[in-house]
Design a protein with these regions (language model features):
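Structural preference for solvent-exposed beta-strand-turn elements
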Residues: 1-424
């Protein structure tokens, strides 16, 4: 995929539906009684993996051009799959569905692509085992493939060593099948889409500080879900609009949940001209984002803000390379166990472009403001790497080439079309 320099990015976009919310809408709709209607669902490969898994467990899910209809069968309505559940590239599918499968009356196996087979699953196995679950890493390395034999589960009060919405959600979903109230305490609050949506479906989930608790055996009822635009997908156009001369971009109906809005806060700290318009809340808070070209400067990104922007850090690092001054990113060691080692991969790519960047154990230090040039960038099949460097390619001199650039289909199949539509 070749990307060339652009100026005057102008226009209006509706970015794809939020990936986290799309996954959860299908999962919770499958466990609800009645039909759940989902609009603005993300038709990316990861979310389609979730649909595939639940279809294999007997759930009727209809897809058409404008909506998804999930005909749920209740909390105990899933059927034993006749084949391995293929999660593809989706860590969210793997970790959340494991919590559900732990409480079923059947045995199932989960597997995915090479990336999934290297990502850490002990972080969900540990709390599930403490609840009495039977979950095994078939290669004995704490990674997929996993075999899960459903069993009666015990309630737990789990102290998670990582701030991870996937871990928290896995435990809360298993808690629906437990014998008492189950809770998860995190070191820092992670995204809270599970808590919001489970309550909307009829569960009793309470949150206090960094602890979330769920009562067992909830009766979930089918609902209508309007998925907001994904702020992680919007991030690329926020950055492109800020960095490309003469730009004005309006991003419509973007989710601005405070557990996800760290990108906006960092951009503001860097001097960004971003205006929120038409703010509203319908389950999740949303707004239109108006982006104008801005002169950016370095900042420090650390601490409690990290879980709110963990997926946006590759894009923030690219922004920092074009900004004046030094940007320090720390407390982000979680980047090492994403679809790629994003600390190493971002560092490699930016160095190829001529940036001054040093990796650290938990982040990176970027001395911005140097002229950057086109280069050949390896995406390592990581969609967020491909999109971050595509934005870099619209700003730097020369042509930037992205190896395996089509991996964007994981979360944003129309990404390149949308990017080029703004430059016309």
């Amino acid at each position: 995929m070749e990307i060339k320099k652009q100026t005057n990015l102008r226009g209006e976009l509706t970015v794809p539906g939020d990936k986290s919310i799309s996954h959860r809408a299908v999962m919770f709709g499958s466990l609800a009684q009645g039909t759940t209607k989902i609009t603005h669902f993300l038709e990316g490969a990861d979310c389609l993996s979730t649909i595939s898994c639940f279809r294999k467990m007997g759930i009727d899910i209809e897809r058409n051009a404008s909506e998804i209809l999930v005909h749920g069968k209740g909390l105990h309505g899933l059927s034993a799959p006749s084949e391995t559940l293929d999660v593809g590239n989706s860590g969210t599918t793997t970790r959340l569905i494991s919590g559900i499968l732990a409480g079923q009356s059947f045995t199932s196996e989960l597997n995915g692509d090479a990336s999934i087979q290297s990502r850490p699953m002990k972080r969900i196995m540990t709390p599930l085992l403490s609840m009495g679950a039977d979950i095994v890493s078939l290669r004995g390395n704490g990674c997929a493939p996993l075999r899960i034999t459903g069993k009666p589960l015990h309630a737990t009060h789990y102290q998670s060593p990582v701030a991870s919405a996937q871990v928290k959600s896995c435990v809360l979903l298993a808690g629906m099948y437990a014998d008492g109230i189950t809770s998860v305490t995190e070191p820092v609050l992670s995204r809270n889409h599970t808590e919001i949506m489970l309550n909307y479906f009829g569960a009793n989930v309470t949150s206090q500080g960094t602890t979330a608790s769920i009562e067992p055996e909830p009766v979930l009822n089918g609902r209508e879900i309007k998925v907001p635009g994904d702020i992680s997908s919007a991030a690329y156009f926020i950055a492109a609009g800020l960095l490309t001369p003469g730009s004005e971009i309006l991003l419509k109906n973007v989710g601005i949940n405070p557990t996800r809005d760290g990108m906006l806060r960092v951009c503001k700290a860097m001097g960004a001209d971003i205006t929120l318009l038409n703010a509203s809340t319908e389950g999740e808070p949303t707004a239109d984002l108006l982006i104008h070209t801005s002169s950016l400067h370095g900042t420090t990104v650390e601490g409690e803000i990290i879980p709110t922007l963990i997926d946006e850090i590759p894009m923030i690092a690219v922004m920092a390379a074009f900004a004046e001054g030094t940007t320090v990113i720390r407390d982000a060691q979680e980047l090492k166990v994403k679809e790629s080692d994003r600390i190493a991969v971002v560092t490699e790519g930016l160095k190829r472009m001529g940036a001054d960047i040093q990796p650290t154990d938990d982040g990176m230090i970027i001395h911005g403001g140097k002229p950057l040039h086109g280069a050949e960038i390896n995406s390592y099949l990581d969609h967020r790497i491909a999109m971050s460097f595509a934005v870099a390619g619209t700003i730097c001199d020369g042509t930037l080439t992205i190896k395996d650039g089509d991996c964007v289909k994981i979360s944003y199949p129309e990404f390149y079309e949308d990017l080029y539509s703004l430059g016309k």
